[in-house]
Regions:
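Conserved catalytic motifs of ABC-family nucleotide-binding domains
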Residues: 172
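Helix-to-loop junction immediately C-terminal to a conserved catalytic motif
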Residues: 69
């Protein structure tokens, strides 16, 4: 009997209203959305699998992750996290996932790192003892143990990024969604974090990982499969080795370049 996928996406579409200015902006709510971000894509990620989303800027990578993270709604279609529909049951879905992007972290910048993470732990209904134990473990893993009592506003960009990653991991989510996971990290810290993702979270703890990345060496190191998005459509979904074999390429970079040049998208199957 096949297990239920950790992430399921069915005929997912997302349109955004076109940008307008002046008097046209007054009619914005009445305008039919015309800018396509996702064009009815379907795919599934199995439990304990690591999948990388790869594509050019504007391909729909961040939009897909934001829908799965319950931050924006799809126009049509369905998406589920651990069998929880992200549109119908967003609170249940959020409990199953961790999400991090290198953008705005949404921290209380005048509070300490410890206070920020403690607040997040309380939002996830952790007891004080459980929160302290998980905070200590996660802080050590992410290399922020010495920064716990510093105000967030005093941290460097790279350190703030680490704190954001720690927050995403704090409640030990079943599904982890990451947008450019090693952005702003120095090479050594990035290598350590990649090992944490693949060896600790995915292999040892069975965490399901879906991440967007432009760094193909990172994709090769972490991903079991690669989902290639172009103009909101899935053009390929296979293992790095499978992509190379299908395109007769010797490297993943060559394979993705050849696939990106194809004009006819191929819809993946669940």
């Amino acid at each position: 009997m096949m297990s239920t996928p950790a992430i399921s996406v069915e005929s997912l579409e997302k349109y955004f209203p076109p940008a307008r200015s002046g008097w046209r902006a007054l009619l914005q709510p009445l305008a039919r959305p015309t800018e396509l971000a996702l064009a009815g894509i379907s795919f599934a990620v199995e439990r304990g699998e690591a999948v990388a989303i790869v594509g050019s800027n504007g391909a729909g990578k961040s939009t897909l992750l934001r829908i799965l993270a319950t931050l924006i709604l799809p126009t049509r279609g369905r998406a589920s996290i651990a069998e929880c529909d992200v549109e119908r049951h967003p609170s249940r879905a959020r409990y199953q996932l961790g999400y991090h992007t290198g953008g705005d972290e949404g921290f209380y910048t005048r509070l300490s790192v410890r206070e920020n993470l403690g607040f997040f732990a309380a939002m996830n209904n952790m007891s004080r003892a459980e929160a302290q134990a998980r905070l200590a473990l996660t802080a050590e893993r992410m290399g922020i143990a010495r920064e716990l009592d510093r105000q967030v506003r005093t941290l460097s960009t790279g350190m703030t990024h680490r704190v954001g990653l720690a927050r995403a991991l704090l409640h030990q989510p079943a599904v982890l969604l990451l947008d450019e996971p090693t952005r702003s990290l120095d090479p050594l810290a990035a290598a350590d974090f990649r090992r944490l993702l693949k060896d600790d979270l995915v292999r040892q703890h069975g965490t399901t990982l879906l991440f967007a990345s432009h760094t193909l060496s990172e994709v090769e190191q972490i991903a079991d499969r690669v989902l290639l998005l172009e103009a909101g459509r899935i053009t390929a979904f296979d293992s790095p080795r499978g992509l190379c074999a299908a395109t007769r390429a010797t490297t993943l970079e060559d394979a993705i370049t050849r696939l990106a040049r194809r004009t006819a998208p191929v819809q993946s199957q669940l």
